[in-house]
Structures are given as structure tokens and as C-alpha cells.
UniProtKB/Swiss-Prot annotation:
It is found in: Cell inner membrane. It comes from Escherichia coli. Pfam families: MFS_1. One of its GO terms (biological process) is proton transmembrane transport. Belongs to the major facilitator superfamily. TCR/Tet family. PANTHER family: FI18259P1-RELATED, ZGC:174356. The keyword Ion transport applies. The gene is tetA. This is Tetracycline resistance protein, class C. This protein is used as a marker in many commonly used cloning vectors, such as pBR322 and pACYC184. Resistance to tetracycline by an active tetracycline efflux. This is an energy-dependent process that decreases the accumulation of the antibiotic in whole cells. This protein functions as a metal-tetracycline/H(+) antiporter.
């Protein structure tokens, strides 16, 4: 099944899923203030964020493997049903252990990015995959911009309103999938080994595949570097530019919009014109240059033109995903996408800890060091990019 209708449905599902995730983020600290002692809010908030990323790391490979066996549609629908029930319970039961349990369930059901990626690989011809992966990233980005904005507005009415809205949104997403989503991969009714449920073992399938292993290493590094702005943007903006909360929110919205536009309208043409390899290199170069410029920026307005570079750097990841998806057959797309989603979640757990530690250690002397370290990490990708196998994995 290779139709535009299928692509529209899965992109709509990804967008609504991202909005649902973003809806609850602005109110989590406020909700914690209502149910725990004020001195422990920061620690609880950090644990809740880490729990979400940890569950995605543990469950993304499993969901990907399940979708290879049973098909993409039932796994996606089951996850959406679980998310709907989870958000509905959290909206009506303001108890700390329920909040923790809810973030665990949300992390499990939010690991569907792997299945969505496999779905797109199923319905897309090789030459269009980079563009369609870019569209998927753009839709997720749009949802993550719209979700927090809507969550903040609803949170002003009630701290529980965003959770209720997320439940409704996931319910609508479930209905969309039930009536409009077609199966893209019938699956193989073969037994699932126990190692499929081990997130570490889920990477072993790539050990004998030189190209895949090298490209997954590049993927991990790129995702790790991407954690630098995620972890530092707010605190760096406050310390370096003296930005207010309103200004920080505005800058995040602008960056989200620019990133979505680049993913939607630049990735496809750039990949078709220059090839996947050059698109990846160009993305890393733009990102690294943006980091270096931010490290030395002295005025808040300078960050906004630099955002264009950072957004342009986003073209590299969809090109890399497309390249990776062509290295495995259709029956293992879910396993591949699950491994990639697990790597992303792993960087979401470790990246902020590493980046903020560097920032804290250097802030008293020069708070731009973490950006330079992030840019330098791209150099680690060069050995993988120079491998002889790399040239065989690219298309022009």
C-alpha cells in the first residue's frame, strides 16, 4: 500500500500524538505543587521526565518488534487506547503515585514513534523516504509547539484541563486510526524470542551489519548533540541574554516553527538534489556552526538569525533515517525504527545530565563551553562517514 491517503493519516496521527504529549508539559510543575512539598518539586519533576524517557527506551524496541509480527495498525491503536485511558485517569485523580504511574504509561504508549516510522517506510518508495521522514518530524514539531501553547492556556483555567484535553485528543486520534488507517504490513506470525523484550538485546541484530551499525552510531551522536539546546536553551537564555519567561517562550515557538518548516520543505528537495550523504553532512555543518555562533553571541536578538542555521541542521536526521531504512528489509522495519527510538530515548536520559553538568562546571568562567562541546561531537561521526561501506549506503 503506497498512497498519499495513508501518508496523510499517519502524519495526522503523529501530529495529534505530539499535541497530546505537549499539552501536559506546562502544567506538570504546577500539579506537583498541589500534591507535594515545595522543596521536593524540582526532584520529582526531574524524575517524572526521566521516567518518561526511560520507558520509551525500554518499550520502543518491543513495540517495533510487535509491529513486525502483528502489523503496524493494531500496535498503534492499542497504544492510543492506552494513552486515552491514562490521561483520563490522571485528569481525575490528583495523587502522586497516580502521576508517576501515568508518566510510566505515557512513556510506554508514547513510544509509538518507532511504529509510525516503520509505517512510513512501508508505504514510501526509497527515493521519497527522506522527504516523508522529514514531514513526520515536521508534524511532530508542529504538535510539540502547539501542544505546550494550548496546555499553558488550558492550565490557566485548571491544572487538570490539559490532561482531559489530551485524553480527548488521543480518543479522537484512536477513532481516526480505527476508521481511516489501513494496515501497511501484515506481519509474520512467528514466535517472538525473549530477547525482543530486552532493550539492550534489541541492538544486537545490527552487530553483523557494518553499514547499519555505523549509521546507528551516527544517529546516536546526532541525537545526543540535539540534547544540547533541549537542555540549555532556557537556562542559557536567562543567564546570557537575561531573557524573561515570555521571551523564552517566544524564542521556543519561533524555533519550533522554523524547524518544522525546514523539515517539511527543505529536507526533501535537498536530499533529492544532493543525495542523502550530502544532506546529512550539510545538516551537521549547519548545526555545528549555529552552536559555535550561539556560544559567542552577546545579544539576545542574535539568537534569532542563528535559529535559521539550527533549523536547517534538522535536514540531516530525516536523510539519515531514510538511508538506514533502506538497509533492512520490510519485515525488520519495525525492529530498526524501534532501535532508533530507543537510542533517541537513551540520549534523552543521558544527554541533559551530561550537558547540564558541563554547563554547571563552566558557567562561572564561560557559559558557552557546552555549545562548543556539542559542535565538536559531530567530529566523532567522521570515522563512520569515511567508511568504505558508507559510499555503498548512499544514493545521489
Amino acid at each position: 500500500m503506497k498512497s498519499n491517503n495513508a501518508l496523510i493519516v499517519i502524519l495526522g496521527t503523529v501530529t495529534l500524538d505530539a499535541v497530546g504529549i505537549g499539552l501536559v508539559m506546562p502544567v506538570l510543575p504546577g500539579l506537583l505543587r498541589d500534591i507535594v512539598h515545595s522543596d521536593s518539586i524540582a526532584s520529582h519533576y526531574g524524575v517524572l521526565l526521566a521516567l518518561y524517557a526511560l520507558m520509551q527506551f525500554l518499550c520502543a524496541p518491543v513495540l517495533g518488534a510487535l509491529s513486525d509480527r502483528f502489523g503496524r495498525r493494531p500496535v498503534l491503536l492499542a497504544s492510543l487506547l492506552g494513552a486515552t485511558i491514562d490521561y483520563a485517569i490522571m485528569a481525575t485523580t490528583p495523587v502522586l503515585w497516580i502521576l508517576y504511574a501515568g508518566r510510566i504509561v505515557a512513556g510506554i504508549t508514547g513510544a509509538t514513534g518507532a511504529v509510525a516510522g516503520a509505517y512510513i517506510a512501508d508505504i514510501t518508495d526509497g527515493e521519497d523516504r527522506a522527504r516523508h521522514f522529514g514531514l513526520m518530524s515536521a508534524c511532530f514539531g508542529v504538535g510539540m509547539v502547539a501542544g505546550p501553547v494550548a496546555g499553558g492556556l488550558l492550565g490557566a483555567i485548571s491544572l487538570h484541563a490539559p490532561f482531559l484535553a489530551a485524553a480527548v485528543l488521543n480518543g479522537l486520534n484512536l477513532l481516526l486510526g480505527c476508521f481511516l488507517m489501513q494496515e501497511s504490513h501484515k506481519g509474520e506470525r512467528r514466535p517472538m524470542p525473549l530477547r525482543a523484550f530486552n532493550p539492550v538485546s534489541s541492538f544486537r541484530w545490527a552487530r553483523g551489519m557494518t553499514i547499519v551499525a555505523a549509521l546507528m552510531t551516527v544517529f546516536f551522536i546526532m541525537q545526543l548533540v540535539g540534547q544540547v539546546p533541549a537542555a540549555l536553551w532556557v537556562i542559557f537564555g536567562e543567564d546570557r541574554f537575561r531573557w524573561s519567561a515570555t521571551m523564552i517562550g517566544l524564542s521556543l515557538a519561533v524555533f519550533g516553527i522554523l524547524h518544522a518548516l525546514a523539515q517539511a520543505f527543505v529536507t526533501g528537495p535537498a536530499t533529492k538534489r544532493f543525495g542523502e550523504k550530502q544532506a546529512i553532512i550539510a545538516g551537521m555543518a549547519a548545526d555545528a556552526l549555529g552552536y559555535v555562533l550561539l556560544a559567542f553571541a552577546t545579544r539576545g536578538w542574535m539568537a534569532f538569525p542563528i535559529m535559521i542555521l539550527l533549523a536547517s541542521g534538522g535536514i540531516g536526521m530525516p536523510a539519515l533515517q531514510a538511508m538506514l531504512s533502506r538497509q533492512v528489509d520490510d519485515d525488520h522495519q519495525g525492529q530498526l525504527q524501534g532501535s532508533l527510538a530507543a537510542l533517541t530515548s537513551l540520549t534523552s536520559i543521558t544527554g541533559p545530565l551530561i550537558v547540564t553538568a558541563i554547563y554547571a562546571a563552566s558557567a562561572s568562567t564561560w557559559n558557552g563551553l557546552a555549545w562548543i562541546v556539542g559542535a565538536a561531537l559531530y567530529l566523532v561521526c567522521l570515522p563512520a562517514l569515511r567508511r568504505g561501506a558508507w559510499s555503498r549506503a548512499t544514493s545521489t
